[in-house]
A protein has these predicted regions:
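Predominantly extracellular beta-rich ligand-binding scaffolds that present long acidic/polar faces
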Residues: 1-187
Length: 187
């Protein structure tokens, strides 16, 4: 178990799969992650099913190719009581699975009581962008008590949304978004 005791700046993602509990203790991590060819660009590249991140704020900028988010590139665990104000960008024509909290959250994972006010964007123009305010892709995941007030910027005409861009089998409950532009998509 880890507890953050001060605000910090991070320039590289935690690359190993995170299996413990990380309590941000109300502090903010400012990210400066700029790797246009990078996958799983976020504070935590991957959160395992046993992993939990809570009470954390994210600021700064994150740029990557696939699985790009504020807290997690890929989440299989639990993210609770977190916020993102960072600009999250999927670079290149292949920039996809981009979300404010997680690029992808899947297979029984949870995102609870979180919000995004950062701009979420992708340079991809084709199908499969999966761009969302909370999670880019959320198959078989649970997203509850969350909101998005961040702008969603994409060249794509499908697979983007205020909460989740894609998500076969996703459960979204008690979530809302503040309208910015013409959001559509899964939720």
């Amino acid at each position: 178990s880890y507890t953050l005791t001060a605000d910090i700046t991070v320039t590289e993602p935690y690359a190993n799969e995170f299996t413990g509990t990380f309590d941000g203790n109300g502090h903010t991590v400012t990210l400066a992650l700029e790797n246009e060819a990078g996958e799983c660009q976020a504070l935590f590249s991957k959160i395992a099913a046993s992993g939990k991140v809570q009470n954390l704020g994210i600021a700064g900028t994150v740029t990557g190719k696939k699985y790009v988010g504020g807290i997690a590139g890929k989440n299989a665990g639990s993210i609770e009581n977190c916020k993102n104000t960072a600009a999250i960008k999927g670079a290149s024509a292949d920039g996809r699975w981009i979300g404010g909290i997680a690029g992808e959250t899947s297979n029984g994972s949870k995102i609870l009581n979180c919000y995004n006010i950062g701009t979420i964007s992708s340079d991809r123009s084709g199908k499969g962008v999966c761009l969302g305010g909370i999670a880019g892709n959320a198959p078989s995941a649970k997203i509850s008590n969350c909101y998005n007030a961040g702008q969603i910027v994409t060249k794509s005409t499908t697979n983007y949304g205020a909460i989740a861009g894609c998500g076969y089998g996703v459960t979204v409950s008690n979530c809302y978004f503040i309208a910015v532009d013409n959001l559509k998509g899964v939720y």
